[in-house]
């Protein structure tokens, strides 16, 4: 139940850090969403769990957290520059792009989930994909992990849900 969950604001920070007049907030939230979708799609293979956005008067600063920064930056920062120009073209504002490395990708829930999804796209068995991901997370030092896959698993006609868990998962 929600009552037994940890209060999220104590353990997580906002992904958008800016303040605006009331009439602009809606447009800026939509713009943030557009930026996130575009960057996530552009860097699909690089493992991007989180994109933080800060705004000052006329500059939008993006902090792109990624598992494989070399792939994002490219040779002499060419790929980063290409991405920055593409985002500038998308929103029509000046953009600063900072790449932040994710220290331990096997401990990041978003990256573990995306990794399982990529394996399912390659037609690997859902059981094996989940067990492999859970094993890697536990070896990386996680105290516990719970994993769930749902849908037409293995091409079945009737959709189902499969759960696996390992270690301790107190109160979420």
Task: Enumerate the predicted regions with their spans.
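Elongated, mostly alpha-helical coiled-coil "stalk/stator" tethers of large membrane protein machines
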Residues: 99, 116-117, 133, 137, ...
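Short, hydrophobic/π-rich interface segment
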Residues: 138-140, 148-172
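Beta-rich strand-turn-strand
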Residues: 126-127, 131, 136-144
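Short, small-residue-biased leader/transition segments that mark boundaries at the very start
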Residues: 1-7
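Short beta-strands and strand-coil junctions in structured, solvent-facing domains, enriched
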Residues: 59, 69-72, 135, 144, ...
């Amino acid at each position: 139940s929600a009552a037994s969950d940890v209060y999220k604001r104590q353990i997580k920070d906002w992904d958008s850090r800016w303040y605006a007049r009331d009439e602009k907030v809606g447009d800026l939230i939509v713009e943030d969403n557009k930026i996130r979708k575009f960057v996530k799609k552009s860097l699909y293979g690089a493992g991007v769990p989180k994109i933080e956005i800060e705004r000052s008067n006329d500059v939008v600063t993006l902090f792109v957290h990624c598992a494989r920064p070399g792939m994002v930056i490219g040779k002499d920062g060419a790929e980063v520059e290409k991405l920055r120009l593409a985002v500038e073209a998308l929103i029509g504002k000046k953009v600063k792009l900072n790449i932040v490395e994710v220290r331990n990708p096997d401990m990041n829930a978003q990256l573990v989930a995306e990794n399982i999804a990529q394996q399912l796209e390659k037609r690997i068995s859902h059981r094996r994909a989940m067990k492999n991901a859970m094993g890697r997370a536990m070896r990386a030092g996680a105290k516990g992990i719970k994993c769930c896959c749902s849908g037409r698993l293995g091409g079945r006609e009737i959709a189902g849900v499969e759960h696996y868990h390992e270690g301790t998962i107190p109160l979420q």
